[in-house]
Amino acid sequence: MINMIILVVFALIGLVVGYSAISIKLSKAKEQAETILLKAEQDAVNLRSQAEHDADHLRVTAERESKAQRKELLLEAKEKARKYREDIEEEFKSERQELKQMENRLTERATSLDRKDENLSSKELALEKKEQSLADKSKHLNEREENVTQLEAEKQAELERIGQMTIAEAREVILTETENNLTHEIATRIKDAEAQIKDTVDKKAKNLLAQAMQRLSGDYVTEQTVTTVHLPDDNMKGRIIGREGRNIRTLESLTGIDVIIDDTPEVVVLSGFDPIRREIARMTLEALIKDGRIHPARIEELVEKSRKEMDNRIREYGEEAAYEIGAMNLHPDLIKIMGRLQFRTSYGQNVLRHSVEVGKLAGIMASELGENVALARRAGFLHDMGKAIDKEVEGSHVEIGTEFARKYKEHPVVVNAIASHHGDVEPESVIAVIVAAADALSSARPGARNESVENYVKRLRDLEEIASSFDGVQTSFALQAGREIRIMVHPNKISDDEVTILSHKIREQIEKNLDYPGNIKVTVIREFRAVDYAK
């Protein structure tokens, strides 16, 4: 019994040990299977990567070969096209040569015929001249024959009269005749001398002007009425326009310049006849683009800042021009006035550059004539300064310039040169005449001026002057090439009810005094602001 139990126990132990061994083998088999599976997955990933790499390599190789083939075909096609073009051009060249030869032959024949025609005409004219000459000689001989007969009769009568005279009377007659003959001879010689002097003076004057023009060289560009501003990208156009167009309206109202935004990439066009306004608008717009803050309040701030910068630039332009011409010790106000001429045109010609050119020409001519060169250059430089303020002060630019020259104690020769350069008064010195001649040279040379541009600018200025002539008007701007006039009024002087009446009055004055194509839109703007500060 005990043996049976022992056998059973050993059997159970054997079963437990066998189960444990089997479990261990199963675990090892499972681990081996997992290892094999991981290795298989890694191999699969490696194989996939290798396959993708091989596929990419094959694709790149195929694309390279395809590009090489395309390039080769393209080069071959270009070579064929080049050869075909050369063949065609060679054919055209030969045909053109044949046509040129035919044209030359026809031209030679035509020239030969013209020459023969001219020879015949010349011979005919020569015969006519000979006939006319013979007729004139015959007529002259007849007249001389008549004169001789008349003189013989007069001499006979004179001899009869002298035969009845006393010695004193005969002496008086001889002296009278001698005096008459000498008077006639003297008058003839004086007349010949005057003609010779005039001819000599004309030649010397022409030589002097030619020398002055040859010794002066200047670069000029015709002034335009538009300015372009380049943008960093086209998205900036929307920011410049602003919500419902408020930014662009503010900029146009403050500067009086048309801001044109079209399909041209990365460009905004500023259009206006007044160069100072246009330059202020350009400076403001560039500052806004650089700053990035574009809204009405910022626009107003930068417009005011640009106006102050413009004053400094005007003074710098005047100083540079005065230094270039050698006009020393100019009054600061005169320097600023001359600087404003940089933004003033006359028939498309920049007035400041014109003034510098006149000063240089006057200096050259003065040196040739032995006059004061510095004074001539100064007078030529200042001769048109009245144009800088002719819109602000009553009178012509000559009258205004003369008045300011006297006000700032300029030399009397300079004052007279300014007053006389358009012939309003008589020149009192050689320098005044030189300045007038230099002004005519600078302005009348071909290409210096453009009358159509000046007429356009004058029409817009007249339009603004009509609007600004009414009481209560603060500023007025001609926009859209003169198709619109925008008027800003003082809110304390013009009420809302009077705005409509004012627009009608301005419209009536425009219709009465101006000739213009189409319609002109009259816009009157009354803006009232109340500002206070919280402390």
From Swiss-Prot:
Residues 351-444 form the HD domain. It holds the Pfam family RNase_Y_N. Residues 103-149 are annotated as: Disordered. Its EC number is 3.1.-.-. Gene3D superfamilies: Hypothetical protein af1432 (1.10.3210.10), K Homology domain, type 1 (3.30.1370.10). SMART domains: HDc (SM00471), KH (SM00322). GO terms for molecular function: RNA binding; RNA endonuclease activity. Signal peptide: none annotated. CDD domains: HDc, KH-I_RNaseY. The keyword Transport does not apply. It is an enzyme of class 3 (hydrolase). Endoribonuclease that initiates mRNA decay. This is Ribonuclease Y. The lineage of its organism: Bacteria, Bacillati, Bacillota, Bacilli, Lactobacillales.
